[in-house]
Amino acid sequence: MRVVILGSGVVGVASAYYLARAGHEVTVIDREAGPALETSFANAGQISPGYAAPWAAPGVPLKAVKWMFEKHAPLAIRLDGTRFQLQWMVQMLRNCTAERYAVNKGRMVRLAEYSRDCLQALRADTGIQYEGRTGGTLQLFRTQQQLDGAAKDIAVLQEANVPFELLSPAELKQAEPALAAVSHKLTGGLRLPGDETGDCQLFTTRLAALAESLGVKFRYNTPIDALAIAGGKIAGVQCGNETVRADAYVVALGSYSTNFISNLMKIPVYPLKGYSITAPIVDAAAAPVSTVLDETYKIAITRFDQRIRVGGMAEIVGFDKTLRAARRETLEMCVNDLFPGGGDTSKATFWTGLRPMTPDGTPIVGRTPVSNLFLNTGHGTLGWTMSCGSGQLLADLISGKKPAIQADDLSVHRYLKDAPGQTRPAYA
């Protein structure tokens, strides 16, 4: 089968690789000059199935109000003047109940755990290298309230049989020796030994090369204007003056997926702006061994070979990609507070990206009401974590195979209601 994939981020490239392995003739189209040059370029570097959790959680609405008055708040909201933003936020608020949180987190952990298994199999099969580490992830708590609040996450981990360790301040330094100097600032930590880290952009670039060796064609610097429709199906992709035709089409355009298919269906994927800095390591002993997540500021600090990546935060501000100095200040403050002297933040590069977020946190992967159109988008902050599993899942669906995990609640159909001649978002 001929398959066209729109988007060459980590999710699009993973989809291409697994589809090619399944024997399909695959073409990837992207407006950028190469793979992983937008959202996948400089993310936090975590592959963390155990920490897969929706931003829509109990208590978040009240926290959001409090964060409005904090200098280093992990969340910021600025109205972008669109009705869609307001609808999306209302839908997110409706997912902030304990019941919805448990359902959504369960879905996310299921896909994320499967994705890590797929990544490990890929690594064993190909030997792909991407500055990866398998030292686990460590969530750091600065208050007793945060430590107590981890109970609901631990319950989900136990239900999903995800290994974890609850660490005291004294035990934190066994996982991350450099934290010994600041253990008095911490009340404890939740360690997930099965999690991993790695450079997402490097991984995507090398996976694209592997996909090319399987026959995948990459068309970069190519405009993606519209989908051509005929007889209720996709007849091609309009790319400038050319129409590219295939048997099946995959939209993996991240935050831009929503507008691109808006004439066909309304999907609630909104850009969640995040930031990162990447600093050279100056003292390896003072740098992290693997990765930590500061629960207070929602910031991840990840060790690559000779660099430290510090990333996180969320801004609901539309497609604004302005680099804000205050956000860099927060990232520098966090890493210098926990790992003083580990990296030279004065020489750090500063980046921002738009994560494609759904109101319930779960991505949209699978079939659509249009028979030959598939979606692989909406992964939020977990595109790197969920990429391989999402790609394999999509390849199975397009190939007519039964997926290895439950997939019906991951598709767009959970958001759509039938209406005469159309589909629309289930906001009501």
UniProtKB/Swiss-Prot annotation:
It is an enzyme of class 1 (oxidoreductase). It comes from the Bacteria. It catalyses: a D-alpha-amino acid + A + H2O = a 2-oxocarboxylate + AH2 + NH4(+). Its EC number is 1.4.99.-. It comes from Burkholderia orbicola (strain MC0-3). Coiled coil: none annotated. The keyword Transit peptide does not apply. This is D-amino acid dehydrogenase. Pathway: Amino-acid degradation; D-alanine degradation; NH(3) and pyruvate from D-alanine: step 1/1. Keywords: FAD, Flavoprotein, Oxidoreductase. Belongs to the DadA oxidoreductase family.
